[in-house]
């Protein structure tokens, strides 16, 4: 009703979202939809460095100055009790579409959509932020007798949000990902088309291409400069202008990679190997890549990890967890030391004053040590089946492909084959020789294979040495060959 009222009265609406992939795809989707019915639509993405995550007073002040009467918050807002009260005093209403865990106190807004609310009866709880926004659009269309065909066009954005935000690819998310990928392969929107062209790959595109190819580029805009650039490219209708935006994003992504490598190297040298957790900080680290660095550190030191950047006595960090350990709960037990925090079981963001950081490091280590199990501290490969390497062929892959799209809770099957060997052409690849390319010998020839981050194993498999290998199977088309 509040959206209908705003459209009928031609009130100004602000679409407000987070600066990550889920947030920017949500904003692009809602902006494009509402623009059809009300020309008084703007969007706002907070600056990662000046405002931080979520609803900011600066954003609300901007809304007030531009005479906004309704803010639709996407992928954020569920914990913004004070900020939404602040907006209410200014005569601005809020609709919240979020999927993060709520605190005990829910903001007083015109509407709060979040399937993780304890009293929410919606049957599927694992929607992405973009997914929650899509359900709002869907409900609006049902109420106003607008055909579902009118909103199918947004499934491409929805598929990218599902893949990038690491939500389970089950239930509705699986449907969104499947049909969204179908749309991406048939007729992607111009903004996605130019980003996909930058991958240098040919169709068909998979959810992995979106997660590891498109998503980092969208994220790079908010990490290095401002996420507005990501929304600009996603909503752009002009191909040539979209190409210009995509080129800028590509440059930012390259810069992000450089910072990622540099900071990871510095962080590894600072790690205390005798702890159950890792918490590191530096005023020289770029705020935009600390989450990536935290993930990288877990690859080498498998334990709950938080990496902070520092500016003006305030530390802003990203937390990443290991299998089945709830890092959000662990951080919650240290919340009295924090300025703010939010997130999921496996990833979270937090802000703390520098004067409290060493107290936090000690408390977090204590919490982790008391709650983490031995099993959670050991990286594992969950294997679905042992098979003979000779069974891997196109027919076998066609069967596997029927289970796609793959992702959390619907992972690509992992197989193990024993006593295999390379055909003699194995080599280390990548600028730093950190990856491994090999051809595993079979009765019918060989299977091209890549081991990312496995360059160190080259000596163990060269010269025909036999080895056991765990792997998943993907299709790669190059120069007409599959």
Listing of model-derived features with the role each one plays in the protein:
Residues 72, 219, 400, 471:
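A residue-level signal for conserved active-site and pocket-lining positions in enzyme catalytic cores
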Residues 49-51, 80, 100-105, 119-120, ...:
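Short gly/pro/ser/thr-enriched loop/turn and capping motifs at secondary-structure boundaries
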Residues 29, 107-146, 151-164:
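Short alpha-helices
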Residues 80-81, 165:
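Intrinsically disordered, low-complexity regulatory tails of plant transcription factors
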Residues 444-462:
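Beta-strand/loop nucleic-acid-binding surfaces
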Residues 1-70, 90-91, 141-362, 370, ...:
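Hydrophobic helix-and-loop "lid/oligomerization" segment in the mid-to-C-terminal part
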Residues 387-447:
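Accessory interdomain/linker segments of ATP-dependent helicases and helicase-like nucleic-acid enzymes
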Residues 465-479:
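Flexible glycine-rich surface loops and low-complexity tracts that mediate binding to linear polymers
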